[in-house]
Amino acid sequence: MKGSYKSRWVIVIVVVIAAIAAFWFWQGRNDSRSAAPGATKQAQQSPAGGRRGMRSGPLAPVQAATAVEQAVPRYLTGLGTITAANTVTVRSRVDGQLMALHFQEGQQVKAGDLLAEIDPSQFKVALAQALGQLAKDKATLANARRDLARYQQLVKTNLVSRQELDAQQALVSETEGTIKADEASVASAQLQLDWSRITAPVDGRVGLKQVDVGNQISSGDTTGIVVITQTHPIDLVFTLPESDIATVVQAQKAGKPLVVEAWDRTNSKKLSEGTLLSLDNQIDATTGTIKVKARFNNQDDALFPNQFVNARMLVDTEQNAVVIPTAALQMGNEGHFVWVLNSENKVSKHLVTPGIQDSQRVVIRAGISAGDRVVTDGIDRLTEGAKVEVVEAQSATTSEEKATSREYAKKGARS
């Protein structure tokens, strides 16, 4: 019984497998028949279709720009640091207790403005003593002069000897010298008193105070009371390669001030504009550069001491220069070249001689003329004599608008 039961299951399995195999065989024959006419038709059409594809294949899309003629400024650039025109550490010239500060931190002050006061009591006393001594010696001098006048009369009658007259004359001269010393002492005491009132030596901005009211200060303090930086005007010190020195000197000989621009770290924003002040008198042998100083009015306080900026100095303007976008300029084994478009939108390679250039544009001194069209994008797909399709650059805004329009269209189709 068990053997017959197993035999029946084996027969069932074999029948199922055979049925599946027959189904797949039949399905494959139908697919082959349906595909054969289409393949034959495609084979019949392929020679002509291939030739048409070769004749009318899609043109390589490129972007182009026209070479223009314009005046191009020539700049020398360098990295620099803003420095104050003057930096002064305000220190006391006398010793004493700091009684008052008359400025706000960060305040702009003028030369002569009162900044601080030191206790003047001791200096007033010293001045009074000097004045008293001067008055005393003046009285002594007046008496000595009267005695001298009497001696001069008495010597004529031999009532006073010539020696006594000479002694009196010496006393008068000595007292006159004492008076001069007393006057100097008075002036010194007055000066000490004046110095107890500390004033700004230059115009500028005061920094943070270095000492508080009530502290004892002296003329030997190195930190001082406050530091003043003169920022109106303010200077920029930057470096240029030694190869640019001749260009700067030649531009200076033209007699016009050289304009220097200060730009931020990213070179995206112009901070201020000034003029060249001077060149250093020697080249740094280590770096092969020379220091250059420019001065800025800085009334808007756009520049700040110790600020790092990019300097651009205008040294010349090239008139009637042929200019193209920098993206069009390429470099090959033969040198610099550009792809030029003719009236039929066919490209040809032109060797060129570049001049002044930056990230946006380049001057072409030889190789093309104003009005020539040059390829600026799609250059990697070009070959000599190839015909191309000139397309306009698509802005990011336009791309977003088109994408949005397609999205709305899809939503409309779904709804």
Curated annotation (Swiss-Prot):
Keywords: Cell inner membrane, Cell membrane, Membrane, Signal, Transport. Residues 1-21 form the signal peptide. Its main location: membrane. Residues 32-59, 392-415 are annotated as: Disordered. One of its GO terms (cellular component) is plasma membrane. It is a peripheral membrane protein. Residues 399-415 have a biased composition (Basic and acidic residues). HAMAP family: MdtA. Belongs to the membrane fusion protein (MFP) (TC 8.A.1) family. PANTHER family: MULTIDRUG RESISTANCE PROTEIN MDTA (PTHR30469:SF12). Part of a tripartite efflux system composed of MdtA, MdtB and MdtC. The MdtABC tripartite complex confers resistance against novobiocin and deoxycholate. NCBIfam families: PRK11556.1 (NF008589), RND_mfp (TIGR01730). This is Multidrug resistance protein MdtA. The lineage of its organism: Bacteria, Pseudomonadati, Pseudomonadota, Gammaproteobacteria, Enterobacterales. The gene is mdtA.
